[in-house]
């Protein structure tokens, strides 16, 4: 670090690759006896994946459907038309980032990666999908 940084705000850190792979997503229900049970059998098609985060600089969402190429969606903290952050400033955002999945739940691998030394504070994930069954449950 060069120069006098008295009173300056800055981050010090070591760059390392962060990787988180989500487990397979299933619909669940509460059976009469209590607890939670996976609804198996019907087709669940994941449509979108949304990451919610707090004071985060950047990360990537990687979607790999079985038999297809991996799609990487980078989040950089900058949004088109944003007037709060100028070029050259550190962009730490509290927001959400939605990407397309378009794959069946059992055939989609969803990963979050980051190699930035800046903060990456992931809070939760949400998915939206289509559920189709051809039979009635008794």
Where are the regions that the model predicts?
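Beta-sheet repeat architectures centered on beta-propellers
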Residues: 1-138
């Amino acid at each position: 670090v060069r120069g006098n940084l008295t009173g300056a705000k800055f981050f010090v850190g070591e760059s390392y690759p962060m990787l988180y792979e989500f487990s397979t997503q299933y619909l669940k229900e509460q059976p009469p006896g209590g607890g939670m049970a996976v609804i198996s059998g019907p087709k669940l098609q994941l449509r979108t994946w949304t990451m919610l985060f707090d004071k985060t600089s950047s990360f990537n969402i990687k979607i790999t459907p079985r038999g297809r190429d991996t799609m990487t969606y980078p989040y950089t903290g900058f949004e088109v038309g944003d007037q709060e952050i100028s070029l050259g400033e550190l962009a730490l955002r509290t927001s959400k980032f939605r990407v397309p999945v378009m794959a069946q739940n059992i055939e989609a691998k969803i990963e979050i990666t980051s190699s930035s030394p800046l903060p990456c504070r992931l809070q939760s994930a949400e998915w939206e999908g289509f559920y189709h069954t051809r039979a009635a449950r008794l």
